[in-house]
Amino acid sequence: DRIMRLRERFGSDRIIALLGNHDEWVVNGSSTISNNSVYARIEEWEDESDDDEYINWLSSLPLYYVEGNTIFVHAGIDEEAGDMWEWETSEDVFTSKYPAETGKIEGLDMKVVAGHVGTAEISGDKFFHDIYFDGESHYYIDGTVLDSGVIPVLMVDTENDKYYQVTDSGKQLIEPYEE
């Protein structure tokens, strides 16, 4: 609801929302807003009377967004497709790709920013819930918020190819994750 209102207030060109796997389940009818574990934790969505409004809104969300040399996506892209990723990636990969991939994407000079898989799992550190950068092509931003209470905030300067983690104390350039 908040994201919908933010888009109404500031415009869909400034507030970008992407379709994710839970949203896709609601749109295709395999789940409802009130019984979907992500939405069920939000009291205001326990009333199914507004479901049509949310379903229509979710149906309008794009699968990815590109700004500069950065692809923003819920889960990932078909990396074997290289620079043909936009045409070769299936909808289920955009929304449900698993496991997360790391390393250089051959044939594609772009970065991918994705969520879906928790950074604790990607890093192999159950206590890591910050932004994960593999040092090559991937930034993962799923801090497993329902377990950790952490919502990592990423600021991207696409003109200068700089990626920052934003916290209450300011912004910090993201360095590759080190074990």
Across the structure, where does each feature detected by a protein language model lie?
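Active-site neighborhood of divalent metal-dependent phosphoester bond hydrolases
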Residues: 1-68, 79, 96-103
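Short, surface-exposed, charged loop/turn segments at secondary-structure junctions
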Residues: 31-36, 76-94, 128-129
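Active-site-proximal beta-strand elements of phosphoester/diester hydrolases
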Residues: 70-76, 139-141
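The start of beta-strands in P-loop NTPase/AAA+ ATPase cores
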Residues: 15-16, 69, 111, 137
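Histidine-centered divalent metal-coordination motifs
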Residues: 21-22, 74, 113-118
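Short catalytic/ligand-binding loop motif for oxyanion handling, primarily in non-cytosolic enzymes
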Residues: 24-28, 73-75, 79-82, 121-123, ...
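Short, well-ordered beta-strand micro-motif
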Residues: 66, 72-74, 153-157
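Acidic, His/Gly-rich catalytic cores of divalent-metal-dependent hydrolytic chemistry
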Residues: 102-179
